[in-house]
Amino acid sequence: MKTKLGFNRLSRKSSHRRALLKNMVISFLKHEKISSTKAKLFEVKRFAERLITRAKVDTVHNRRELSKFIHDKYILNKLFTKISPVFRQRSGGYTRMIKLGKRYGDAAEMAILELVEKPLKVE
């Protein structure tokens, strides 16, 4: 029996967890860098990598599928036009996590999640 497969529940109910991840992924795609606890960033990384992989093929179907998760049209357009073209030759590993150490208040492991390559400057 395979155990411990799946995802981290982050001590939240499913709707709260989904909203948290959705907001963090949108912030990550907007700013191309995000700082939070290591556990949250592992989950954000999983979603962001899937979204970038899906956005590498710019079709109407893929745009509609990703718009179910990303409701901001500006971020969706940025993902398809600026972020995903940079990673066309890369088959995965679009993000990197840099560990920052422990947070002062509760000793939670902190980290930064950022894109491996800088997005295109489209005018």
From Swiss-Prot:
One of its GO terms (cellular component) is cytosolic large ribosomal subunit. GO terms for molecular function: structural constituent of ribosome. Gene3D superfamilies: Ribosomal protein L17. Keywords: Ribonucleoprotein, Ribosomal protein. InterPro entries: Ribosomal_bL17, Ribosomal_bL17_CS, Ribosomal_bL17_sf. HAMAP family: Ribosomal_bL17. Belongs to the bacterial ribosomal protein bL17 family. This is Large ribosomal subunit protein bL17. It comes from Borrelia garinii subsp. bavariensis (strain ATCC BAA-2496 / DSM 23469 / PBi) (Borreliella bavariensis). The gene is rplQ.
